[in-house]
Amino acid sequence: MAFFRGQAAPLPPGGARRAPGGLAGAVRAPPGGRGLRAPSAIGSGRSRGPGRLLPPPPGGLCNACGGARRRRRVPAAASPRPPREAEEGSVSVVLLAGGVGKRMGAAMPKQYLPLRGKPIALHSLAVFEALPEVAEVVVVCDPAYRDLFEAAAATPLKFAEPGAERQDSVSNGLARISSASALVAVHDSARPLVTAGEVQACIGDALEHGAAVLGVPVKPTIKEADGAGFVAKTLQRSLLWEVQTPQIIRPALLRAGFELVAAEGLEVTDDVSVVEALGEPVKITLGRYTNIKVTTPDDMSVAEGFLAEREAAVAA
């Protein structure tokens, strides 16, 4: 027995079988007949159980009944919200280049040592100057090195004096930025391998949360020691991050943090620590392990290797 277009297929004994998701299952044709797949609507209605038919769905009948079957709407999967983008010229950079670099054991501060023919600090400067989001760069350095930066800069620079501690240097640089800046990015000039993509990702997180810092999950096991040099406990590695720079913060938030640190005599070792002291959130932006701080001769060799690989990749 064959079924023709427009003819309702008889339900099997007990009614139509329901397929997962609430649709009727396939109807088996009698021997010698042509099989017919029963959609959600059969004949003039939809099967909801043995012998029970409901009115046809809005929009018409199914194909088996000679009408147009309404397609089932499937909700779209939620897509992640794209990162926020800063407006052009809305970010000020404080480039820290006032360190002495005693651990390098060189005749000059580490940030001025040549790395593949160019001082380390100038590699860092070039990354930020090329970003459309960056309006200005304030270089915190000894006045004796200002000419070095001015000769290499693509745009006019501002300068600030280094302080006794890192937070003093950052505060001096912060005092020189434009009042129109939405964000201030603080970067160690001795990190010459940071990429434009990393900086822009961190800018997006800072716009969203008020403060952000580049970081990478720690690889080794970290142990906390007591005063006598014995292991006190092993820290949970999955929760630990090594933070880098840039550290990007809303200027008003950074200023408020510095005021609190000064008022309470707090000791901080990086810039987002002052935001933490305020109880405000700091987002960690996933960075790369190549964004090293050149501090020792071994670091210099590693940085040379990474930079050579990048140059070779660009030339290929």
Features from the language model and the residues they span:
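Short aromatic/basic micro-patch
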Residues: P114, L193, T234, I248, ...
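Short, flexible, basic/aromatic active-site loop/helix in glycosyltransferases
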Residues: K223-Q247
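Residue-level signal for inorganic ion chemistry
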Residues: L95, A121, G173, H187-D188, ...
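N-terminal glycine-rich phosphate-binding loop and ensuing alpha1 helix
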Residues: A86-R146
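Conserved beta-loop-beta/alpha segment of the NTase-like Rossmann-fold superfamily
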Residues: K158-F159, A164-A225, Q244
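N-terminal chloroplast transit peptides
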Residues: M1-G66
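N-terminal plastid-targeting presequences
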Residues: R72-E85
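Conserved alpha/beta core of the MobA/IspD/sugar-nucleotide pyrophosphorylase nucleotidyltransferase superfamily
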Residues: L240-A316
